[in-house]
Amino acid sequence: MTYRCLLQMVLLLCFSTTALSRSYSLLRFQQRQSLKECQKLLGQLPSTSQHCLEARMDFQMPEEMKQEQQFQKEDAILVMYEVLQHIFGILTRDFSSTGWSETIIEDLLKELYWQMNRLQPIQKEIMQKQNSTTEDTIVPHLGKYYFNLMQYLESKEYDRCAWTVVQVQILTNVSFLMRLTGYVRD
C-alpha cells in the first residue's frame, strides 16, 4: 500500500512539473512576480554617490535589449534564461567592498536560481528543436555584453563604484526581462 502511494506521488510530481512548465500563462505570472521581487531587492542595496555613475562606460548592450523588439515565445525564453544565468554569475563575484547585505544578495540569488529552474526544462526542449534564431543573433551579443561587465568589475578590482555601475546595468536587465515575459504566452 505504501509503495503504491509513493509511486503515485512520484508520478504526480513528474507530471505536474511537466504540466506546469507547459502552462506559459502560469510561467509568465511566476516570472513577473519573481522579477518584481528582484527589482525590490536590488533597490534595497545601497548605492554610492552620483559621481560613481560618471565612471560608467559603454558595455555594448545589445540593441535588442535597448529598444522594443518582437520576440517569439521560444526566443524570449532562451534570452531570459541566458540573461538570468549571466546576472547570477555576476552576483556571485566579490561584492565585499560595496557594503551590500549578504542576506539581500542571497535572496536575490535564490530568486534568480528559482527563475532559471522554472525556465530550464523549456529551454532544453527549445534547444533540442534548434529552430530558434536567437542563437545566431542576440545570444552572442549577450555574451559579449556580460563579458564586458565582468572585465569592468575586474579592472576596477570590484570596488564600490564599479558595483554601483553594474547594479544600474542589472536593474536595466531586470526591466528588459520584465518586457520579455510578455512574450511568454500559451
UniProtKB/Swiss-Prot annotation:
Sugar-modified residues: 131, 173
Record key words, sorted: Antiviral defense, Cytokine, Disulfide bond, Glycoprotein, Secreted, Signal
Signal peptide: 1-21
Pfam families: Interferon
GO molecular function annotation: cytokine activity; type I interferon receptor binding
InterPro entries, per the entry: 4_helix_cytokine-like_core, Interferon_alpha/beta/delta
Cysteine disulfide partners in this protein: 52-161
GO biological process: adaptive immune response; B cell activation involved in immune response; defense response to virus; humoral immune response; natural killer cell activation involved in immune response; negative regulation of Lewy body formation; neuron cellular homeostasis; positive regulation of autophagy
Cell location: Secreted
One Gene Ontology cellular component: extracellular space
Quaternary data: Monomer.
Family: Belongs to the alpha/beta interferon family.
Function description: Type I interferon cytokine that plays a key role in the innate immune response to infection, developing tumors and other inflammatory stimuli. Signals via binding to high-affinity (IFNAR2) and low-affinity (IFNAR1) heterodimeric receptor, activating the canonical Jak-STAT signaling pathway resulting in transcriptional activation or repression of interferon-regulated genes that encode the effectors of the interferon response, such as antiviral proteins, regulators of cell proliferation and differentiation, and immunoregulatory proteins.
Protein name: Interferon beta
Species, as recorded: Bos taurus
Taxon lineage: Eukaryota, Metazoa, Chordata, Craniata, Vertebrata
Gene name linked to the record: IFNB1
